[in-house]
Amino acid sequence: MSSKCNGDCSCTSKVDSGVADKTEMTKNESNDIDDIWGDDDIEELDNSTADIKRMHSKQGYLDGITSAKESSLQDGFDDSFPKGAELGIIVGNILGSLISYDDQELFDQAKSELNISQVLHKRYFDEDLELRSTNDHEVIAKWQNVVQNLENK
């Protein structure tokens, strides 16, 4: 009601309804704001937050595992490459010596037995990638003896 109105006129219902409309509208606006900031969606937010945390945790775990594997793989490569290269040089010397004797059958047999997958097979190495036999690789030692016997003839 306005200050000029004494309430005896027909505008009273309009004023009251206008005030009621404004009050109702304020309540609706308040409810709309409450809906936005209210607790109705907390469960959904908690679930999505938990999903995001789980996803990031899983990705972090995978990244850590991958990094550790790459690191240990690199360390293993760094430690083992010189040993493998040394064995490769010895195999190359054996094959080079054998080919000079003009015995194709002997050369082919040596080439088959001294194949890289045979020479570096895990049965010849321990967990630390050291040769199992004390000093020599069995197959390489065999062919070194063959070459030495050929040279002594």
From Swiss-Prot:
Q: Which domain of life is it from?
A: Eukaryota
Query: Record's Gene Ontology CC terms?
Result: cytoplasm; nucleus
- Region annotation deca-GX3 motif: residue ranges? 60-100
What is the protein's major site of localization? cytoplasm
Q: Name one process (GO BP) from the record.
A: protein maturation
Q: Which UniProt keywords apply?
A: Cytoplasm, Nucleus
Give the Pfam families listed for this entry: Yae1_N
Subcellular location as annotated: Cytoplasm; Nucleus
Q: Does the keyword Cytoplasm apply?
A: yes
Give the function comment from the record: The complex LTO1:YAE1 may function as a target specific adapter that probably recruits apo-RPLI1 to the cytosolic iron-sulfur protein assembly (CIA) complex machinery. May be required for biogenesis of the large ribosomal subunit and initiation of translation.
What is the official name of this protein in its record? Protein YAE1
